[in-house]
Amino acid sequence: MGKIIGITGGIASGKSTVTNFLRQQGFQAVDADAVVHQLQKPGGRLFEALVQHFGQEIILENGELNRPLLASLIFSNPEEQKWSNQIQGEIIREELATLREQLAQTEEIFFMDIPLLFEQDYSDWFAETWLVYVDRDAQVERLMKRDQLSKDEAESRLAAQWPLEKKKDLASQVLDNNGNQNQLLNQVHILLEGGRQDDRD
């Protein structure tokens, strides 16, 4: 069984920067968001579940999901958010478990980028968990800029996940992304070489 490292963070904290860098270094890195996108394509397991629940109005003329509408339906209603988390969580976990088993056969070390790693209790899948951390104000600002959201909309999306401060206490390693990209990737280099960012383990 290969060594599996989980990568997590929050919306707009810089997870994908780390995941892309790891791929450039030759590592396999499963991106849970990309898996979700595949499952949400027409005919995918999540697509079918979402259309059955919300109805045809969430399908665009080209047959794809209307993601902005879907996000607003889910994020504006706590009940819908709860349903979405549960059903999507179950289907996604099954798909990720299959990918994990496949990679464990061939890879000495590989990574899985899972945004809700702690919230949905994936911790015991991993030998280590790396958290990409950024201060709350910077996170809100980056999210507003990236997705063209108002401050209230950005805050509402962040509220759907645990605060990064809470995740910080649970992670094996913390990658600080309050600086620039080079500083972030330098920390990844140190971990890949077996160094330790801190002495908590």
UniProtKB/Swiss-Prot annotation:
Localization of this protein: Cytoplasm
The keyword Nucleotide-binding appears for this protein: yes
DPCK domain mapped to chain residues: 4-201
Alphabetical keyword list: ATP-binding, Coenzyme A biosynthesis, Cytoplasm, Kinase, Nucleotide-binding, Transferase
EC number(s) per entry: 2.7.1.24
Enzyme class: transferase
Chain residues that bind ATP: A12, S13, G14, K15, S16, T17
Gene behind this protein: coaE
NCBIfam families recorded: dephospho-CoA kinase
GO cellular component, one term: cytoplasm
Catalytic activity: 3'-dephospho-CoA + ATP = ADP + CoA + H(+)
Domain of life where this protein originates: Bacteria
Entries under CDD domains matching the protein: DPCK
Function: Catalyzes the phosphorylation of the 3'-hydroxyl group of dephosphocoenzyme A to form coenzyme A.
Pathway recorded for this protein: Cofactor biosynthesis; coenzyme A biosynthesis; CoA from (R)-pantothenate: step 5/5
Protein name as catalogued: Dephospho-CoA kinase
GO molecular function: ATP binding; dephospho-CoA kinase activity
Gene3D superfamilies, per the entry: P-loop containing nucleotide triphosphate hydrolases
Gene Ontology terms describing biological process: coenzyme A biosynthetic process
InterPro entries: Depp_CoAkinase, P-loop_NTPase
Similarity field: Belongs to the CoaE family.
